[in-house]
Structure formats: C-alpha cells, structure tokens
Amino acid sequence: MFQDKYVFSQLTAFLNRTQFNNYVRKYGGNRYVKHFTCWNQMLAMMFGQLSNRESLRDLIVAFEAHRAKQYHLGLGREPIAKTTLATANRNRDYRIFEEFAFYMMKEACEKRTTNILDISGKKYAFDSTTIPLCLATFPWAKFRNKKGGVKAHVLYDIEAQVPAFYTVTTASKHDSTLLSSIHYEPNTYYIFDRAYDSFKELYKIHLTDSFFVVRAKTNLKYKTVQWKRRMPKNIMTDAEVKLTGYLSEKKYPESFRLVRYYDEEDDREFTFLTNAKQLSALDIANLYKKRWLIELFFKWLKQHLKIKKFWGTTENAVRIQISVAIITYCLVAIVQHDMKLKRSTYEVLQILSISLTDKTHLRDLFDKTNFNDVKDLNNPLIPGLFD
C-alpha cells in the first residue's frame, strides 16, 4: 500500500478524505477554485505543523525546496505562492476545518479509549490556554489595553488522551462562561480547576446524572452537614457540605462533598468539591491529578502555534491554524493506535518532523529509527503524552 510513497503521504492516507469533502461541499470551500483546493490547503498546513515551520515564508521556502515532490505529497501540481496560502486562510470558511477537527477528535476518542482508573464512565478535563497575539496586527483579538490574544477552550478525554471538544474565543472571555458550551453526558466525570466553580453549571452537571470534581476557592462559604471520622492517609477532610451564601445556595441548593487532600510530593493541600459520593476520597484526588494530561496537550499546542508569525492575521486564519493543529494532533494519535506503535508520542512527532519527505515505510521508520539520532530536537514535551 505504501510502497514508494513519501512518509507524509503515508501519514495523510489515514485521513478520511470523503468526510472532509462533505464539509467542503457544505460550506462551498472549493467554489471557483482551479488549483489549490481545501484539501491541498489542509495538507500544506499540516506539513508546516509537523515540520515545525516558523512562519508562512518559512513554509513556502520548504515547499520550493521540495517542488519536484509537491504533487506526490498531496499539495497539488501548481507551485504554492505565499499569497495563495494566505488568501485561502483568510477567505475559506474556517468551519470546514473546525468540523473536520471534531470528526477527527471523535474518531481518535473512540479508538483510543482505555480505563486508566478503575472507575466506570468517561472522564474529561476542561481547561483553556491563552495564545498571545500582537494587538496592532490582530486588532480583533483585543485582550487588554495594549495586549491581544485568543483562548482555546478544550474538553480533553483523559483516557483517550485527545481533545473531545474545543472552541476558540478572544482572551478576554472568562473561562467559567464556556461551561455552558459543553454537552454533558450521563455517568461521566468532568474535572475542572477552580476557575470553573460556577455553581449554576455544576448543578446542571449534577442534574444530568454526571459528576464534577473541581478545586474549591479559598473564600468558599459553606456549612458541614456530616463528616467521616476515619479517613485514609493524606485525606484530611471528607465531609458532606451545603453552601451558605444566598446566591450560591440558590444556584446549588443540594449538598455535595468536600474532600481535603495533602499531596506529600508537593507538600501542598488541595480542597475538592464533588457530587461523586460513590467514590473514595483517594479516587477523587487521583481523578484530579489526571488534569496534568490536558496541560501536556496545551504545551504541544502552544509549541506548534508559538511561531514568529501566524500564517494569517484574520480571525478566520487563526481559527483555521488552530483547527489544523488539532487535526494533526489527532492524526498522530490515530496512527499510533492503528499501527500499534511502541514509540512514545514525543518520539513519533520528532521522527516525523525529520522524515516527511523520505520514502520509507512507516513501520520501518518507527521500528528502525534510533531515537538517539533525533535527541538534538529536544523540546519541552514530556514523553508518553498518549501512553
């Protein structure tokens, strides 16, 4: 199947082009297009993500260097000019790429789901990361008086270790207001940092027969209804409580659980609120610990978007670039699963970054490459991102 094909072409063969074309037709993406199609555009952006291009100009230089290989890489027959890619990113509907990203996330989640904790039900972490932008160049992304930025809000499947949902807003949008964008599923655990203690939304989770685990703010006002006297090591408090603030009590009128946990490794105390009364206090603490997986995802996302210049300055172009980054991330996760690779994701990404235009079978590439040869490409990623 992959004989005499470039590594990049073998990789993109895992993409569902039929499904992508459905979104292209839905939004008229290829209307009046003669050469550089939406498919070519997405692959060009993915090539830039995987090869760590620093700017649009840097990406075009790479295409010029591989001009003879361009068609077989899936990038079309015509030379790709800087203005061609910039215009496509500015004018083509970002929803084509966003909806394909949702499709890729669903496929990756379904394939990669495992039970990393002995707790039934899906487990998600929800958080955001801010990507700073120059206000003079991106005036639509105003954050503060002299700053600009966008936020990527992500619902992250901590068992499949891929995003399950995301949305992009300006950085001025408060995190807790995005809770209403989540479609809550029954018998599912949602893990939040303390920026998300909107009791109205937490009660909504409770009423859908799902569960939340959220860090409590230090100024929380509550009364203890009942507490446990015997607790395991490092559990300092395990109590049933009710809110006492007038507005808070109206937003969450029932009692819930408060767990105070001491982390020996960091010498810190954490206070969690949850409606999961069926779990042990240690299970609650261990669930919250899995939040670090979404932080690793944000490190990857920021590294691949932390470039000298975005490949377009409009909101549409920025949304396309973020969507393509997530598509690329999910593609690597799917390839890793389907090929049953024993490599860590860190190794897979690094090997791909220096091998995209090689004619080596993917299996041979990952089986035979000595990772010591690519250690000089070291970055802040922690090995085992999907493992």
Where are the regions that the model predicts?
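Major-groove recognition helix of helix-turn-helix-like DNA-binding domains
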Residues: 72-94
